[in-house]
C-alpha cells in the first residue's frame, strides 16, 4: 500500500467517524447489562414485529415469544417503548454491518454502493402491515427518520469524497449537489417500503432500492 493510498483510506475512515449516530433507545450501559435471555426475547420480538405491532398488547407479546410479562416490563415500561427498543436495535445492527462492509481502501463510489446495499437490508423483509403500522405511529416514524438522516449524512460524506477524487460529475459541467443526491439514493429503501409503494413494485424494497442506486450512480460517474 502506498502512502497516498494509506492517506485516502484514513480520510474515508475519518469522515465516517465524523458523522454523529442517532441517540440509542437503550444507552450503552443498559445494553451491556442485558442478559442472554433478554437479548433472545428482543430478537424474537423483531421477528414478531415484521408482521406489524399495533394490535399487540404486552400480554399478547409475552405469549408469542414465550416469556413472562415481568420479562417484558424489565425491558421497557410500555408496549410502544418496547417496539422502539426492538426496532432501534435492529437498525443499529444493520448499520454496524453496513459500516463493516466497507474496506478503507475502497474508492468512495464503490464504498457508497457497498454501504447502501448493506444498509438496505433494513427494508429487506418489510411487510405492508409493518409499513402501515410504522407510518401510523409517530414515535416509530421519528425513530426511522433519525436513522434515515444518519444514512443520508454518511452517504453525503462518501459522495463528497468521490467528487473530490474525480469519481463523480462532468469536469466541464456544473458541480454535483451531493446533499440532493444523498437524500435520493439513501432514501430509496425507505421510499419503496412505504405502504403505498411496497405493494406496487414487483420486487422487494431492498431489491428495488439497490437497482436504482446503481442506475443513479452510473449516471453520475465521471466519464473516462
Q: What is the predicted role of each segment?
A:
Residues 85, 98-125, 181-182:
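Hydrophobic alpha-helical connector segments
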Residues 51, 76, 132-140:
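Short helix-capping/turn signature of helix-turn-helix
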Residues 40, 44, 51-81, 85:
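Helix-turn-helix
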Residues 35-46, 99:
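A short, Lys/Arg-enriched amphipathic alpha-helix from helix-turn-helix/homeodomain DNA-binding modules
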Residues 1-39, 224:
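N-terminal intrinsically disordered/low-complexity leader segments
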Residues 87-95:
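Short, basic, alpha-helical segments at the C-terminal edge of helix-turn-helix-like DNA-binding modules
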Residues 3-5, 130-134, 141, 145, ...:
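Hydrophobic/aromatic-rich alpha-helical bundle segments in the mid-to-C-terminal region
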Residues 44-48, 118, 122, 188:
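Short amphipathic alpha-helical elements of helix-turn-helix/winged-helix folds
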